């Protein structure tokens, strides 16, 4: 893929560090696509985005921010709120984000799409690839790159870069439902939130 135009969907800086370094050092120069409407609250989203921007600058890599649409993401996750991590909600979340990445890749002439989600040991690699292949099947001219970014020493290098860069390293995946299974407490009463998927009268 060295001579192909690569779009790298990035979930956060800690997961991106070793992947960006590896790609650039091997002659590829990806464009980072930050599409993470799952992240809640908005301040958390911005914090993770700013860390990605900071790291991209160190490598001279372009980063593109997708529109933040948490209400749209909540509609995608509706009915799956109580699913465990690596459950059906995670699969639908990956599909939501990677479809947006695939659409951007198609519209902007990219050949290959891959994601930093595949670097996290907390995520199902099978789910990530299922979502990636599906997303690329919905567009034309974009190939899914099912790379296992946990192998070849990249997991160890990932942890080194987190320390070297002093990255903000989040305690939960991103959405308010994953807060329940992470170390962070939900920042507000989830039950009191209005349902964005219901028609308001």
PLM segments and residue spans:
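Nucleotide-activated chemistry modules centered on ATP-dependent adenylation/adenylyltransferase
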Residues: 1-201
């Amino acid at each position: 893929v060295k001579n192909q135009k690569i779009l790298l969907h990035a979930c956060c800086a800690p997961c991106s560090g070793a992947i960006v370094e590896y790609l650039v050092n091997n002659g590829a120069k990806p464009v980072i696509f930050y599409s993470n409407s799952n992240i809640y609250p908005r301040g958390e989203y911005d914090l993770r985005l700013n860390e990605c921007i900071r790291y991209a600058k160190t490598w001279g890599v372009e980063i593109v921010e997708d529109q933040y649409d948490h209400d749209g993401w909540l509609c995608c996750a509706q009915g799956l709120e109580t699913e465990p991590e690596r459950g059906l909600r995670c699969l639908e979340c990956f599909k939501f984000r990677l479809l947006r990445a695939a659409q951007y890749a198609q519209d902007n002439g990219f050949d290959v799409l891959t994601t930093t989600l595949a670097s996290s040991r907390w995520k199902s690699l099978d789910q990530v690839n299922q979502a990636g292949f599906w997303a690329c099947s919905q567009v034309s001219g974009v190939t899914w790159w099912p790379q296992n970014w946990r192998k070849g020493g990249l997991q160890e290098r990932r942890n080194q870069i987190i320390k070297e860069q002093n990255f903000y390293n989040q305690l939960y995946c991103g959405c308010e439902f994953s807060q329940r299974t992470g170390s962070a407490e939900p920042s507000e009463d989830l039950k009191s939130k209005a349902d964005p998927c219901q028609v308001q009268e």
